[in-house]
């Protein structure tokens, strides 16, 4: 009978044999995709962006909304933490006055 350790090692070796070629093809720099990425990296800053309506000097409405919501969540979390701390102090024997 085959031991479970031997079977596990066989399965791991088979998995590595199947995954290694796929990973090497992903990592390799051959093909059109890396060339397109390189071209996109070179042409990242383009004056035509302003013509497309992409503001680069002002925050978007989504960013402003995100920061307002983040501030609201932080205020609520701070209030909850303060309330919890206060309740713990009043419930503990050290916080009670005799």
From Swiss-Prot:
Q: Does the keyword Transmembrane helix apply?
A: yes
Q: Which residues cross the membrane?
A: 61-81
Q: Which domain of life is it from?
A: Viruses
Secretion signal, residue range per the UniProt entry: 1-24
**Assigned keywords, A-Z:** Disulfide bond, Host Golgi apparatus, Host membrane, Membrane, Signal, Transmembrane, Transmembrane helix, Viral envelope protein, Virion
Its localization reads: Virion membrane; Host membrane; Host Golgi apparatus, Host trans-Golgi network
Query: What topology does the record note for this protein and the membrane?
Result: Single-pass type I membrane protein
Q: Which InterPro entries is this protein grouped with?
A: GN_domain (IPR008647), HSV_GN (IPR034707)
Look up the record and report any one GO term of the cellular component aspect.
viral envelope
One family from Pfam that matches here is: Herpes_UL49_5
Q: Which segments sit on the Virion surface face? A: 25-60
Protein modification: O-glycosylated.
Classification via HAMAP family:
HSV_GN
The family annotation for this protein states: Belongs to the herpesviridae glycoprotein N family.
Q: Note the subunit structure.
A: Interacts (via N-terminus) with gM (via N-terminus). The gM-gN heterodimer forms the gCII complex.
Under which name does UniProt file this protein? Answer: Envelope glycoprotein N
